[in-house]
Amino acid sequence: MKSGDILGETALLEALKAVGEPTRLRLLRLLAHEELSVMELVRILNQSQPRISRHLKLMNEAGVIDRFPDGAWVFYRLSEHPALTPLIDAVLTALGDEQSADLRALEEVRGQRLDAAQGYFENIAPVWDQIRSHYIDDAEVEAAIHSLVGEDPVETIIDLGTGSGRMLSLLAPRAQYAIGLDLSQQMLNIARARTREAGLTGIDFRHGDILATRLNGQSADLVVIHQVLHFLADPGQALKEAARLLKPGGRLLIVDFAPHRLEVMRDEYQHRRLGIGDDDMGHWQKAAGLQSMRSLSLPPHQEPGLTVRIWLMHKA
């Protein structure tokens, strides 16, 4: 057994004390479902923010959960320390699903997130590309995408969170068949019109959740997730779904913002995360069973601006 897999008596006792309280057990169960912000946990448990923060601090200090700030928000998730994971799993198994009220409240929070994001996209769909162009140089990003992906033809491309269909307009000409998936019907309408105008055929646009697509597994040569992950509560699940869709040897292309401090992106544009860091991406990639190929950064040409990160991965 590796030394990192051994917790030690003192740390074990601290971890047991950290979860040995009713509210902290409820927090542990909720964080087993997904990472959550402090204010989301406050709403779900219907307790004061200072009280919830105090419990989270104790659990974080004991190592059973991890704290990570993101701009003005703070998120928490279960620890993945190899010595603590068996203990956390055992506690969760013993707990079962007794707190169904908490899970119902979690679903309400998820629904509120989804409604806010969908409402935003329905409202801004007609001017989505203009909004994006305020922060990034599309031509430079698209040239980098072409460079990374190459010009070789592929059989099937799937664009998760296709939005206005820009990525399919760019990449679908090299594919025999392409699918664009999005939760916003208004966005899909624009994507259909855009690709039809461009004379592109063989593209199927579908309404659906990119975290659970219901598409056939091992069906895609290339999956694209373009400027989507920063909207998601669980980006790792999007990578897992992409990995499920990929054929062996298939590739995943991800484009998103690097970490930044522009709170306006959260306040006005419904971004849940202020960019995506390499550490998080590496964690999600590993959990999805994907292997890194290349990545690059495209800094802004003017301020305030956002650096764009592009990652290319493949499925062994």
What is each model feature region?
Residues K2-I6, P82-D129:
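Amphipathic alpha-helical dimerization/coiled-coil segments
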Residues L7-P50, V74-P82, A144-H146:
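N-terminal helix-turn-helix DNA-binding core of bacterial DNA-binding proteins
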Residues I136-E155:
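Conserved alpha-helix/loop element of class I SAM-dependent methyltransferases that forms part
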Residues I158, S164-A212:
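Class I SAM-dependent methyltransferase SAM/SAH-binding core
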Residues L211-V223:
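A short acidic, Gly/Pro-enriched loop at the edge of an enzyme's catalytic core
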Residues D221-D234:
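A short SAM/SAH-binding and catalytic strip from SAM-dependent methyltransferases
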Residues G236-R251:
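A short glycine-rich, Lys/Arg-flanked "PGG" loop and its adjoining helix->strand segment in the class I
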Residues R251-T307, W311-L312:
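C-terminal alpha-helical "lid/dimerization" subdomain adjacent to the S-adenosyl-L-methionine
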